[in-house]
Amino acid sequence: MKKMLLHELHPALVHMPLALLPTAAAADLISLTTRDGAWARVARRIWVVGSASALLAGVAGMAASQEVRLETPRARDMTFLHGVGNATVLLGALGVTAWRLRREPTSTTVALGLGACGLAVYSAALGGKMVYEIGVGRPGDVQANPTLLLSRNAPLVLVRDALRGALWLVSRARALLSGGHPLAPGAAGAEEGEAPTVPSPVQAFPGQERPMPQA
Protein backbone atom coordinates (compact mmCIF):
# COMPACT_ATOMS: atom_id res chain seq x y z
CA MET A 1 0.00 0.00 0.00
CA LYS A 2 1.34 3.40 -1.00
CA LYS A 3 2.26 5.62 1.93
CA MET A 4 0.58 9.03 2.06
CA LEU A 5 2.76 12.00 1.17
CA LEU A 6 2.66 15.35 2.91
CA HIS A 7 1.27 17.23 -0.09
CA GLU A 8 -1.69 14.83 -0.16
CA LEU A 9 -2.90 16.15 3.20
CA HIS A 10 -4.61 19.17 1.62
CA PRO A 11 -7.06 17.23 -0.61
CA ALA A 12 -7.75 14.92 2.32
CA LEU A 13 -8.76 17.81 4.62
CA VAL A 14 -10.41 20.26 2.25
CA HIS A 15 -13.75 18.44 2.17
CA MET A 16 -14.43 19.31 5.81
CA PRO A 17 -14.63 23.11 5.42
CA LEU A 18 -16.39 22.71 2.07
CA ALA A 19 -19.16 20.85 3.88
CA LEU A 20 -19.18 22.63 7.25
CA LEU A 21 -18.98 26.30 6.23
CA PRO A 22 -22.03 26.23 3.90
CA THR A 23 -23.91 24.30 6.60
CA ALA A 24 -23.06 26.98 9.16
CA ALA A 25 -24.13 29.76 6.79
CA ALA A 26 -27.40 27.97 6.03
CA ALA A 27 -28.09 27.43 9.75
CA ASP A 28 -27.50 31.14 10.41
CA LEU A 29 -29.88 32.02 7.58
CA ILE A 30 -32.57 29.77 9.05
CA SER A 31 -31.99 31.27 12.50
CA LEU A 32 -32.25 34.80 11.13
CA THR A 33 -35.45 34.15 9.21
CA THR A 34 -37.22 32.03 11.84
CA ARG A 35 -35.84 33.71 14.99
CA ASP A 36 -35.10 30.23 16.33
CA GLY A 37 -32.27 30.38 18.87
CA ALA A 38 -31.57 26.66 18.54
CA TRP A 39 -30.41 27.13 14.96
CA ALA A 40 -28.16 30.00 16.07
CA ARG A 41 -26.48 27.80 18.68
CA VAL A 42 -25.98 25.00 16.17
CA ALA A 43 -24.54 27.42 13.62
CA ARG A 44 -22.12 28.87 16.17
CA ARG A 45 -20.63 25.47 16.89
CA ILE A 46 -20.39 24.58 13.21
CA TRP A 47 -18.66 27.90 12.45
CA VAL A 48 -15.98 27.06 15.01
CA VAL A 49 -15.34 23.56 13.68
CA GLY A 50 -15.57 24.68 10.06
CA SER A 51 -13.13 27.55 10.53
CA ALA A 52 -10.67 25.31 12.37
CA SER A 53 -10.80 22.76 9.55
CA ALA A 54 -10.41 25.55 6.98
CA LEU A 55 -7.30 26.75 8.79
CA LEU A 56 -5.77 23.27 8.77
CA ALA A 57 -6.66 22.72 5.12
CA GLY A 58 -5.28 26.16 4.23
CA VAL A 59 -1.95 25.52 5.92
CA ALA A 60 -1.71 22.15 4.19
CA GLY A 61 -2.56 23.77 0.86
CA MET A 62 0.09 26.46 1.24
CA ALA A 63 2.64 23.75 1.94
CA ALA A 64 1.45 21.62 -0.97
CA SER A 65 2.02 24.52 -3.38
CA GLN A 66 5.73 24.21 -2.62
CA GLU A 67 5.86 20.42 -2.79
CA VAL A 68 4.39 19.78 -6.25
CA ARG A 69 5.80 20.70 -9.62
CA LEU A 70 4.14 23.64 -11.36
CA GLU A 71 5.75 23.40 -14.77
CA THR A 72 3.61 25.83 -16.79
CA PRO A 73 2.54 29.46 -16.23
CA ARG A 74 -1.09 28.34 -16.30
CA ALA A 75 -0.48 25.79 -13.54
CA ARG A 76 1.35 28.33 -11.39
CA ASP A 77 -1.24 31.06 -11.81
CA MET A 78 -4.20 28.73 -11.30
CA THR A 79 -2.53 27.56 -8.09
CA PHE A 80 -2.08 31.22 -7.15
CA LEU A 81 -5.78 32.00 -7.69
CA HIS A 82 -6.75 28.84 -5.82
CA GLY A 83 -4.59 29.90 -2.88
CA VAL A 84 -5.88 33.48 -2.86
CA GLY A 85 -9.46 32.24 -2.97
CA ASN A 86 -8.89 29.83 -0.11
CA ALA A 87 -7.14 32.51 1.97
CA THR A 88 -10.04 34.91 1.41
CA VAL A 89 -12.57 32.26 2.41
CA LEU A 90 -10.54 31.50 5.53
CA LEU A 91 -10.36 35.15 6.58
CA GLY A 92 -14.09 35.56 6.01
CA ALA A 93 -14.89 32.42 7.99
CA LEU A 94 -12.66 33.48 10.88
CA GLY A 95 -14.27 36.92 10.91
CA VAL A 96 -17.80 35.53 10.98
CA THR A 97 -16.80 33.01 13.65
CA ALA A 98 -15.30 35.72 15.86
CA TRP A 99 -18.55 37.70 15.57
CA ARG A 100 -20.76 34.68 16.19
CA LEU A 101 -18.92 33.63 19.34
CA ARG A 102 -20.32 36.70 21.11
CA ARG A 103 -23.28 37.85 19.05
CA GLU A 104 -26.31 36.56 17.21
CA PRO A 105 -26.33 36.34 13.40
CA THR A 106 -27.20 39.44 11.40
CA SER A 107 -28.06 39.97 7.76
CA THR A 108 -24.50 41.19 7.22
CA THR A 109 -22.83 38.11 8.71
CA VAL A 110 -25.20 35.83 6.81
CA ALA A 111 -24.37 37.63 3.55
CA LEU A 112 -20.65 37.39 4.29
CA GLY A 113 -20.96 33.70 5.09
CA LEU A 114 -22.90 32.92 1.93
CA GLY A 115 -20.49 35.00 -0.15
CA ALA A 116 -17.53 33.12 1.31
CA CYS A 117 -19.23 29.85 0.44
CA GLY A 118 -19.73 31.01 -3.15
CA LEU A 119 -16.05 31.88 -3.41
CA ALA A 120 -15.18 28.49 -1.89
CA VAL A 121 -17.12 26.74 -4.67
CA TYR A 122 -15.15 28.65 -7.32
CA SER A 123 -11.85 27.93 -5.60
CA ALA A 124 -12.77 24.25 -5.32
CA ALA A 125 -13.53 24.19 -9.04
CA LEU A 126 -10.06 25.57 -9.72
CA GLY A 127 -8.61 22.85 -7.50
CA GLY A 128 -10.41 20.23 -9.55
CA LYS A 129 -9.08 21.70 -12.79
CA MET A 130 -5.57 21.76 -11.37
CA VAL A 131 -5.71 18.02 -10.69
CA TYR A 132 -7.86 16.61 -13.49
CA GLU A 133 -6.92 18.94 -16.36
CA ILE A 134 -3.38 20.09 -15.59
CA GLY A 135 -2.29 17.09 -13.54
CA VAL A 136 -0.88 18.94 -10.53
CA GLY A 137 0.22 16.53 -7.82
CA ARG A 138 0.15 13.36 -9.91
CA PRO A 139 2.54 10.55 -8.92
CA GLY A 140 5.93 11.40 -10.32
CA ASP A 141 4.98 15.07 -10.69
CA VAL A 142 6.13 16.21 -7.26
CA GLN A 143 9.37 17.66 -6.00
CA ALA A 144 12.33 15.34 -5.50
CA ASN A 145 12.36 13.32 -2.26
CA PRO A 146 8.77 14.10 -1.17
CA THR A 147 8.08 14.02 2.56
CA LEU A 148 5.95 11.23 4.00
CA LEU A 149 2.96 12.45 5.99
CA LEU A 150 3.76 10.28 9.01
CA SER A 151 7.50 10.91 9.00
CA ARG A 152 9.26 12.49 11.96
CA ASN A 153 10.10 15.71 10.14
CA ALA A 154 6.67 16.16 8.52
CA PRO A 155 5.42 18.84 11.01
CA LEU A 156 8.54 20.95 10.50
CA VAL A 157 8.36 20.60 6.72
CA LEU A 158 4.65 21.46 6.80
CA VAL A 159 5.23 24.73 8.65
CA ARG A 160 8.28 25.62 6.57
CA ASP A 161 6.58 25.02 3.23
CA ALA A 162 3.38 26.73 4.37
CA LEU A 163 5.38 29.88 5.13
CA ARG A 164 7.10 29.62 1.77
CA GLY A 165 3.74 29.21 0.08
CA ALA A 166 2.35 32.30 1.81
CA LEU A 167 5.38 34.35 0.77
CA TRP A 168 5.00 33.09 -2.79
CA LEU A 169 1.34 34.17 -2.85
CA VAL A 170 2.28 37.65 -1.64
CA SER A 171 5.09 38.04 -4.16
CA ARG A 172 2.87 36.83 -7.03
CA ALA A 173 0.10 39.21 -5.96
CA ARG A 174 2.54 42.12 -5.98
CA ALA A 175 3.71 41.24 -9.47
CA LEU A 176 0.11 40.99 -10.66
CA LEU A 177 -1.01 44.28 -9.10
CA SER A 178 2.02 46.12 -10.47
CA GLY A 179 0.98 45.13 -13.98
CA GLY A 180 4.30 43.57 -14.80
CA HIS A 181 3.17 39.95 -14.71
CA PRO A 182 -0.45 39.34 -15.79
CA LEU A 183 -2.22 36.04 -15.27
CA ALA A 184 -1.49 33.30 -17.76
CA PRO A 185 -4.26 32.45 -20.26
CA GLY A 186 -6.66 29.91 -18.81
CA ALA A 187 -5.54 30.46 -15.21
CA ALA A 188 -8.98 31.65 -14.09
CA GLY A 189 -10.54 28.45 -15.41
CA ALA A 190 -13.42 30.18 -17.20
CA GLU A 191 -11.99 30.91 -20.65
CA GLU A 192 -13.79 29.35 -23.57
CA GLY A 193 -11.93 26.92 -25.75
CA GLU A 194 -9.16 26.05 -23.31
CA ALA A 195 -7.87 22.55 -23.87
CA PRO A 196 -7.02 20.14 -21.05
CA THR A 197 -3.31 19.71 -20.48
CA VAL A 198 -3.85 16.06 -19.53
CA PRO A 199 -6.05 14.42 -22.20
CA SER A 200 -8.45 11.70 -21.08
CA PRO A 201 -8.11 8.48 -23.11
CA VAL A 202 -11.43 7.13 -24.35
CA GLN A 203 -12.53 3.75 -25.56
CA ALA A 204 -15.63 3.14 -27.63
CA PHE A 205 -17.85 0.26 -26.52
CA PRO A 206 -20.14 -1.62 -28.93
CA GLY A 207 -23.76 -0.56 -28.77
CA GLN A 208 -23.06 2.79 -27.14
CA GLU A 209 -23.32 6.11 -28.92
CA ARG A 210 -20.76 7.90 -26.77
CA PRO A 211 -17.22 6.76 -25.95
CA MET A 212 -16.66 5.87 -22.33
CA PRO A 213 -13.56 7.14 -20.50
CA GLN A 214 -11.07 4.49 -19.53
CA ALA A 215 -10.49 3.91 -15.84
At which residue positions do the language-model features occur?
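Short amphipathic, positively biased membrane-proximal segments
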Residues: 1-215
